[in-house]
Amino acid sequence: MTSQLNELVEFLHSPQPAVRQIAIDNLVGFSAGPTSKVFKNDSYRPIKDIIKMIMDPEHGTRVIIQQGVTILVNLSEDKLVRNIILSDDKKFLKFLVWKIVDLTNPNADIMCILLSNLAKDDGILAVLNIKRNSSGEEVDDGLKLAALNKEVFKSLRAMDCLMDCFVKGYDKKLTKYASFNYLAFFFADISRFKLGRMYFIEEQEYDGVVPISKLLVFTEKYDAKVRREGVASTIKNSLFDSETHERLLKDEKINLLPYILLPIASAKDSEIDEEDMFNLPDELQLLPEDKERDPIPAIICCHLESILLLCTTHAGREYLRDKSVYPLVRELHKNVENEDIGELCYRIVNMLMRGEPGAGAVEEMPSKNAEEEEEEESEEEEDDDEEDEIVEVA
């Protein structure tokens, strides 16, 4: 089998389009698992061949592009593969993002997965500088591209267009071909880098809106796990710079806090007294009877980590106290049996309810078990980068 695969992968370099098509069609199934090493032959030449096939304006059919991108998705766990894909003056990256933005592209969703996998490396930051020419026409920087749909996209910047795809394209409302859900993971990973997260927390010139505010509504889309998970991580990563916290909390145009708290709240949180309830953000007062917490503990943990990051400044702690965050966390701790959630709840309480220097005694949160939890002294949350989870396609 090994010799046959080695021979088959050589056909990707054939000058005959029909031969290349047969080769890639038969190689897709070998791109995941131990057999994927065949694509590393001859200094990764098969990867370069596949990239050329995908970008071929004459022979890059819908099927070839789908198969080629699927192979790259499965191989992108390899850092060297990611480097190859992002090399060549980022030409393939430009091709990829503009194909995602092409609303007639039936392969947009699989391309979103590839883009999210590529965002594990800082080379992805080049996407922040990718722009179409002033007219958004079909030929740009030597690439043959679909004309930009100016009714949908009001900016020539790739990052703005990707954001519009994600926000407007939920549930395939923008195009029947794509939901753009995996852009959430792309946003999460690019926000690990300072330049990336600055994009999300600064007002953008083309629409006068802070991008993070567009994402907040998706923290409660319980039918879209990928969106919720990616958006929760993007919010958390956007809070790594403490000097921005006060603005993000108090700017009413952003309105950050309610969308961090809503996923951890339930209508069954019955022991929040009237005064504390009154101090909660408006969105958390009088929750509907069917309001439930996010069903995924890991996503709840991500929001709790965001709260911890907001606790790293005095102004942040005071704001969270004023907004009755402690009673909400107390109810979460009491009603959800999960070790990771419980630990994070205790850490938040230690930050919020121990009081500032010189303050008097404060309320203790009761333990769920007989053993005393060790008190956490540190007031700083370590920057916890996202796990380098690579999506594979079967």
Curated annotation (Swiss-Prot):
One of its GO terms (biological process) is chaperone-mediated protein folding. Present with 20800 molecules/cell in log phase SD medium. Keywords: Acetylation. This is Protein HGH1. Signal peptide: none annotated. Residues 371-394 have a biased composition (Acidic residues). Residues 357-394 are annotated as: Disordered. It comes from the Eukaryota. Belongs to the HGH1 family. The modification N-acetylthreonine is found at residue 2. GO terms for molecular function: translation elongation factor binding. InterPro entries: ARM-type_fold, Hgh1, Protein_HGH1_C, Protein_HGH1_N. Pfam families: DUF383, DUF384. GO terms for cellular component: cytoplasm; nucleus. It comes from Saccharomyces cerevisiae (strain ATCC 204508 / S288c) (Baker's yeast). The gene is HGH1.
